[in-house]
Amino acid sequence: MGMVTATAAAALLASPPQGHLGRRCHLVVPGLRLRPPASSSPPHAAPPLRLSNFVPRCYITNVEVDVSHTSEQEALDDHPPLLPACAIPVVHLRDVPDASPFPLHESASHSTDFEELPVLSEGELHTIAATPAHPAGLYALYASYLFGNLVEQLWNFAWPAALAILHPSLLPVAIVGFFTKLSVFIGAPIVGKLMDHFPRIPMYTGLNAVQVATQLISAAMVIYAMKNVTHASTSAVVLKPWFIALVAAGAIERLAGLALGVAMERDWVVLLAGTNRPVALAQANAVLNRLDLVCETVGASVFGLLLSKYHPVTCLKIACGLMICSFPVLVVLGQLINRFSCHALDSSRTPSEESICANLLDVRKIVQNGLSAIRNGWNEYKQQTVLPASVATVFLNFNVALAPGAIMTALLMHRGISPSIVGAFSGLCSIMGLVATFISSSLVERVGILKAGAAGLIVQASLLSVALVVYWTGSISQRTPLLIFLAAIALSRLGHMSYDVVGTQILQTGVPASKANLIGGMEVSISSLAELVMLGMAIIANDVSHFGFLAILSVSSVAGAAWMFCQWLGNPTDEQRELFMFDPHFQVEPI
């Protein structure tokens, strides 16, 4: 194969084709190949080459011609005969006004037509990472989350308080709580699967309607009991039709509330903040956690204030009015979220997905669909890349002793601790949780989400270990050991809430959007199972003297979560590196 310049090519075209008649000439121009004349034509009278829709002039400067050896027949067979529509004029190089070559070596100065591609600076990249994809939609999400969560937290405080006023025994409250956890354990996977195959906005509206309806039914049952039920035994109360309806409505209400929480915290916030904007996503998660803590405090305070001034039935009627008013507001806010985010929440469904939805909603197959959803959810859950981070979250739910709650309150009251100290301890834990939401976003910005998660778990495990040592070595009835014990538990909430925020973001990053609700529902289901197990352990070890055993189990679960997460962080897989390629932990410093 020989390479000649365009000048030689012009000579070849002008000279008679004698010895090189069987050669084929390739010009480096797409779609243009010169054909030799037919064998029947005179050697010096080659017909002009014709091609339809070609430009009237063709200027070729310093173009190499690839002359390859081939047969004449192959050259003729490669292309069909050219159409006699447009002749291709052969222009000699001397006719071209400017035949200077275009310099391509590095030292040559290039034309301004070839501009350098813009490269973002580190500050600009940080600004993009901290800017949400849809800021207006995110603010609308905050408003919806605040309003809906406030009504939900108010009701979560109202129904146990009303049952406690109705009957002095704790058994009715315990039964409702048990079946609530059981419904979440069984129903969360199938609800999560249904949410993954159903449009977001209609599902959001439907879940809000179900939650408000079940809250109203529960309130109606309690009001009916307060007006009609007199002094009765515990067994007589739990077998009444109104109580059975209360249990069923409470279970459905909790399941709908958790489904809404999973949708907003695992799916919607990711779409609005942006999966590739880790700082903005961390800040959004922190805001949602702050709103949750504020709603939990304000909801309990508002209903407690109402109970101190009005009759319980009047307070429940006020709560019902808030529920009814909340529904249209939540529906409008859902539409605003979608509109402000340029309809990012719209999800078109294919016919196959619609058939899946119809199959899941078939009442005749409810048991089969439930078992299938649990099996499918478990298979998807254990195959996710960020499984250790999710399992660590489940392990943290085993800590029911060294955390603010009913067991800790019972322990302190049994030891004769002043109620004011108990109240101050609960308030301090809430403050630490609120502070942790600010710390977590700062940690993500400085060290990345993976190291921030490890730091939160290590801090919590270390401080709970200190509290356990203080409990076993000193009497918490004394002032100094008691203060150290309570301070260690309160400070451990910094690590707990930090990992709660960061762990949520890790799952948001690692779980695909098409499976976010299914895997999130499965995690909630397993967490409910963990709480049921620890509740059973607490029932078995119901004496306060066995608190040390429960404390050891709690510390062991938190330490196990920290060890598992650090092992996962220290031995990353290729898939994990690819998933968190922008995390500082996996970024290589430039040499």
From Swiss-Prot:
Pfam families: FPN1. Residues 1-66 form a transit peptide. It is a multi-pass membrane protein. Its main location: membrane. The keyword Plastid applies. One of its GO terms (molecular function) is iron ion transmembrane transporter activity. InterPro entries: Ferroportin-1, MFS_trans_sf. The chain crosses the membrane at residues 159-179, 206-226, 242-262, 293-313, 318-338, 391-411, 419-439, 452-472, 482-502, 518-540, 547-569. GO terms for biological process: iron ion transport. It comes from the Eukaryota. Keywords: Chloroplast, Ion transport, Membrane, Plastid, Transit peptide, Transmembrane, Transmembrane helix, Transport. It is found in: Membrane; Plastid, Chloroplast envelope. One of its GO terms (cellular component) is membrane. Belongs to the ferroportin (FP) (TC 2.A.100) family. SLC40A subfamily. May be involved in iron transport and iron homeostasis. This is Solute carrier family 40 member 2, chloroplastic. The lineage of its organism: Eukaryota, Viridiplantae, Streptophyta, Embryophyta, Tracheophyta.
